Amino acid sequence: MNNPRTVSDTKRAFYHNHARPINSIYRRVVEELLVEIHLLRVNQTFVYDPVFALGVVTTFERFMQGYHPPADQTSIFNAICLAQELDPQQVQQDAQELLGRVRGQSLESLLDWISTAASLGGDEQQNRLRAIASNPTFKYSRLFAVGLFTLLEQAEPELGKDEARLLQVLQQVGEVMHLPVEKMQKDLEQYRSNLEKMTQARKTLEDIVAAERKRRQQNAAPDRSPESASATEAPN
C-alpha cells in the first residue's frame, strides 16, 4: 500500500512545475488553494466532478485577478493542477462545458434543470449531478459550493447581493441534491468576504506600486528648482 502524499509533497511538486517567484499577496492564495485541494484529494470519499472543477477555476481566476505578469497565471494554474495529479486542460474543459451547458438559462430554468438531474439524470452533465445526489458518502467541499454558486450567479448575476433569496435558492438545491445547506451558506459567506478582502488588498498594493513609480520618476527627473536653474544659466 502506497503512503498518501503529504502537503509538503504537493507543494514541492507545485514549485517544480512553477519555479518563478509568486508576487506578494498572491502567494498565500496559491498555497491555501494547494492545501485545500490536497486535503480533498487524499480523502478516500472524494470524487472529482465538474462542479468541483468549476469551483477550482472560479476561485483561481477571481483571486488571481490582476496578477503580474499575466502570462504567469496559466503557468501557476497548471502547476496547481499537476501538483494534485490533475490534468489542467481537463479541469478547464470540464468547468467550461458545465457553464456552457446552462448558459442563457434563467435561474428558475436552471433550478428545474438541477432538480431533474438529481432525480432522473439526463444528458452527461445531469447524470454526473445525479451521481452526486445519490451518493451517500459524497465529499462536500467549499470548492464545490463555489462551483455551484458560479452556476447560479451566471443565471442571476445579482443573486449574491440578496441574502434571503440566495438562502432560499441554496435550500432548494440542497434539498434535491442532498447537500448541507448551512455549510454551503457559511462557505459562500466566507468566500465572498475573502474575495472582498483580496480586492482591497490588491487595490492597496496597486496604490503602493503607483506611489513608488511616481517617486522614482520624480527622482530621475532633472532638478529644475530656481537655484539649479540659476546655476545652470550662470555665465562662466
Swiss-Prot record:
GO cellular component term, pick one: plasma membrane-derived thylakoid photosystem II
Coiled coil: 180-220
InterPro entries (alphabetical): Thf1
Annotated Polar residues bias: 227-236
The entry's keywords: Coiled coil
One BP term from GO: photosystem II assembly
Region (Disordered): 206-236
NCBIfam families: PS_II_psb29
Function description: May be involved in photosynthetic membrane biogenesis.
Family of the protein in this entry: Belongs to the THF1 family.
Name of this chain's protein: Protein Thf1
Name of the encoding gene: thf1
